[in-house]
Design a protein with these regions (language model features):
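Hydrophobic alpha-helical membrane-insertion signals
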Residues: 3-4, 9-86, 483-523, 527
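Active-site-proximal, structured, solvent-exposed surfaces of multi-pass membrane proteins
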Residues: 10-14, 60, 657-791
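Membrane-embedded helix bundles of polyisoprenyl
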Residues: 29, 117-134, 140-222, 234-254, ...
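Periplasmic/ER-lumenal interhelical loops and adjacent helix-loop junctions
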Residues: 52-64, 96, 232, 239-329, ...
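Contiguous transmembrane helix-bundle modules in multi-pass membrane proteins
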Residues: 185, 204, 335-496, 744-791
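Membrane-interface helix-loop-helix junctions at transmembrane boundaries of multi-pass membrane enzymes
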Residues: 225-233, 322-346, 455
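Extracytoplasmic/lumenal acceptor-recognition loop(s) of multi-pass membrane glycoenzymes
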Residues: 86, 466-492, 503-575, 613-675, ...
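Active-site lumenal/periplasmic loops and adjacent helix-entry segments of GT-C-fold
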Residues: 36-172, 196-203, 283, 294-307, ...
Length: 791
């Protein structure tokens, strides 16, 4: 308590305590991860967590670090191939935290993940403090509110997603800059932080824009913002300027997203107004009272969209008691209105989706913004001694009652499959543990309120110490549930990815282009090998991949996972080797797949070669129309596409004379033996050489007659092609792949990739930065003149 007292001995006024908050949050975050780093370190591993953190974040950061340093625009290791900017701008391209890691060798990146996480916690706490100190009179309580934000349930939960914390960390600075611009007429910072937040993550920025509108309207309606036409115009200018400065990645992302079916998923009928399950409402309600469970688990409720949604507004120790008190005693304050509006938004699907461009997929990944306001409201009320004596006790009693009411779900009789059990929770022990920890926080807060008078001036320090200490405890519980819940599954993660990559690359040939398959292995193995792998986990790959895969029997949402039974896809996509973890060999053998021969092995993998491998780039003797292809089942589509090239009616008119129309008899010959013959035919028609580059690819072809050459590369507007130096039309065939017409004889084919819209985006951004620099210089000069005139 002495340490806390020294840190908090100064009250309102004086110099900023930003760095005190920063280092407190950094230290607690470091302590939070330290035990798990030690456990992983004893196994000779870097810290790995679970789910998306392992499958995406570690591999993305490592791969992107190396890719950026080597330069280029097209990533062959991303699924079937995708533009780097479009594939990774949602995850890391604009993140200042990612750019910091570029100071390190890419091989060190996995070990940099925890320091970066600690930095994000610290930056989040520091930013929250800077924003809150305007509204919280006592600096000591500003520190408490900032630490509540830094270690809120939302922040701890989203360690799982890592890059979400970038948004949590940077948002408070933009909100502070808005307050400064309106209330103090300090205009320089707001465009800068708008640009930083937009550049950091365009998707989350859309939600931030909605929240800022809510915040702005409530502040004006509540009389805190005194608005006139001149000020409104200045804010509009700064907003547009900030968006222009930060739009470097926006246009390419927008051009890609409008083609992505995951982003175009509107509501229908009742879906606008009510969730499909009553349990969704209960889950939202209890997310304010119970510490968050692991993102990939369901416990208290089984129906509804609950996993991976970031649905939590839990605050350590204080819970939502401060928000309840604030809304009762300061109901006309803008913060009370903001929290009430956000509460309504959370319970109405279409309003919830405003933060995600009206997409009907449920997420709660905007909760960090009202949580920030909730933390400020808590700090503002805790500094009032009279409220701690009266209102807080009642609010805490209500919080305790609501938290304990969840016990009903653990005790209600439940009949399933003729057997009656007690409770409907999926894992009773885990639920009781979560409840116990949540109630421990309630109990600690009760003790703090009970001894408030005895603590007197040390009360803020005591609350801060308990909040940080309890954050460590509940954070450990959450991290442990999440990490060790998949401990067995992820036991070999480091060995079979980063550690095994050099051994695999030493065995696999590199003299010719081919793709890999990875049978039931860890996600994104191809990134560690820097090779194209048809098993891939990324939500924002080239949109044509999401168009192509469903037509050939592969569900493509966030993953590409073609089943082993779809053997014909391996030929179509030039898959030469399948990597099978040794512990999965029995499952692999049960598939009874023909045409695969064991050719090598490494410490963890057996390597099977595809005897029906077809090199990249080949031609056809036949084509099939879209109408005829629609009669083919998804499971047989790959077989048919090895026989014929799928063309639109317009393409048939232009290129139909080069090939014959596939007959029904030929279309129905889809046995394995037919597939082998088709692979042989395609192999004989393949280009003589194919070279993948970081800006596209080149190929050499020797054709007997003019024909379309298919490359199983996802179609992208960023590609241009030349054949023998002459610009050629890039055709979109096979529902998402690329082809180009080549003449008879020898041809040199060059495909060059430029990220569509990137040049224009960067130009706008650069121009806006120049305008911003001039504008800031003018503001600075004007300020100096005013100061000199006053002097």
């Amino acid at each position: 308590m002495k340490i806390g007292g020294k840190l908090l001995e100064r009250k309102t006024g004086g110099r900023s305590r930003y760095w005190q908050v920063f280092w407190l949050c950094f230290a607690v975050a470091a302590a939070l991860f330290l035990p798990h780093c030690i456990i992983d370190g004893l196994n000779g591993d870097f810290f790995h967590y679970a789910g998306d953190f392992n499958d995406q974040q570690i591999s993305f950061y490592s791969y992107a670090n190396n890719f950026v340093k080597q330069g280029g625009g097209f990533s062959w290791a991303t699924d079937l191939g995708s533009g780097f900017v479009n594939s990774y701008s949602f995850y890391l391209c604009g993140s200042p935290f990612f750019w910091l890691t570029l100071l390190l060798p890419y091989r060190w990146t996995p070990w940099a993940m925890v320091p970066m996480l600690c930095l994000k916690f610290a930056v989040a706490g520091g930013g929250a403090y800077l924003w809150m100190r305007r509204w919280v009179k006592d600096e000591r309580w500003s520190m408490v509110g900032a630490c509540l934000y830094a270690f809120s349930g939302f922040t701890v939960y989203n360690v799982f997603f890592n890059h979400f914390l970038d948004v949590v960390a940077l948002f408070p600075y933009m909100l502070k800059a808005l307050d400064d611009a309106v209330l103090d007429r300090r205009h320089g910072a707001f465009p800068f932080w708008v640009a930083v937040n937009l550049l950091n993550n365009y998707f989350f920025f859309a939600g931030q824009a909605v929240f800022l509108i809510i915040y702005f309207v409530c502040m004006v309606a509540g009389g805190r913002y005194k608005l006139n036409l001149r000020l409104f115009g200045a804010l509009a200018f700064q907003t547009v300027l900030g968006c222009c400065m930060g739009c470097a990645l926006l246009v390419p992302a927008a051009l890609s997203l409008v083609q992505n079916p995951r982003t175009i998923d509107p509501f229908n009928g009742y879906g606008y107004l009510v969730y499909g399950s009553a349990q969704q409402y209960l889950a939202i309600f209890y997310s304010a009272f119970l510490m968050p469970d692991a993102p990939y688990l369901k416990d208290l409720f089984q129906e509804g969209i609950l996993k991976h949604t970031s649905m939590t507004v839990y605050l350590p120790v204080v819970g939502i008691a401060g928000g309840l008190v604030f809304c009762r005693v300061r109901r006309r304050h803008p913060f009370a209105r903001i929290m009430k509006v956000c509460l309504i938004c959370a319970f109405v699907p279409v309003l919830n989706s405003m933060f995600y461009a009206l997409n009907s997929s449920y997420y709660a990944r905007w909760y960090y913004m009202p949580v920030l306001v909730l933390c400020a409201a808590t700090a503002m009320t805790l500094q009032k001694a009279n409220l701690c004596e009266t209102e807080y006790r009642r609010a805490l009693g209500l919080v305790a009652l609501c938290t304990l009411s969840s016990i009903a779900f653990a005790l209600v009789p439940n009949e399933k499959d003729g057997t009656t059990t007690i409770g409907v929770v999926e894992e009773p022990l885990r639920y009781w543990g979560i409840l116990l920890v949540s109630m421990l926080g309630v109990g600690l807060f009760w003790l703090l309120l009970h001894y408030r008078r005895q603590l007197a001036a040390r009360f803020p320090a005591a609350v801060l110490a308990v909040v940080l200490g309890f954050s460590f405890v509940y954070g450990q519980v959450h991290l442990s549930i999440t990490k060790y819940g998949q401990w067995y599954h992820d036991a070999d993660y480091v060995q079979q990815t980063r550690r095994e990559a050099p051994e695999l690359n030493a065995v696999l040939p590199d003299d010719v282009f081919y793709r890999l398959d990875a049978y039931d292995s860890y996600n994104n193995l191809g990134l560690w090998l820097d090779k194209s792998c048809i098993q891939f986990f990324n939500s924002t790959v080239a949109p044509s991949i999401l168009e192509f895969y469903p037509t050939v029997g592969v569900k493509r949402d966030v993953n590409s996972k073609p089943e082993a039974s779809l053997y014909a896809l391996r030929g179509l996509l030039s898959v030469r080797y399948t990597l099978v973890p040794k512990e999965k060999v029995e499952d692999w053998e049960k598939e009874k797949l023909e045409g695969w021969n064991l050719v090598s092995s490494t410490t963890s993998y057996l390597i099977y070669e595809n005897e029906n491998w077809v090199p990249m780039g080949f031609t056809y003797d036949s084509y099939i129309t879209e109408e005829n292809f629609e009669t083919v089942s998804d499971t047989n589509a790959g077989n048919v596409l090895m026989k014929a090239l799928l063309l639109t009616d317009e393409q048939v008119e232009r290129y139909g004379q080069m090939m014959q129309n596939l007959t029904d008899d030929e279309k129905n010959n889809i046995s394995y033996e037919d597939y082998v013959q088709d692979c042989t035919a395609r192999r004989e028609s393949a280009v003589t050489s194919f070279t993948a580059t970081r800006t596209g690819f080149t190929a050499q072809a020797d054709l007997e007659a003019e024909n379309l050459v298919l490359f199983s590369v996802p179609y992208d507007d960023g590609f241009t092609a030349t054949v023998n130096g002459v610009p050629a039309e890039v055709e979109k065939v096979d529902n998402g792949l690329m082809a180009v017409a080549a003449p008879a004889g020898h041809s040199e084919i060059v495909f060059t990739y430029h990220t569509a819209g990137l040049r224009q985006s960067v130009a706008v951004s650069a121009g806006a930065i120049v305008v911003y620099a001039v504008w800031v210089a003018v503001l600075h000069r004007k300020k100096r003149r005013e100061e000199s005139s006053v002097g």
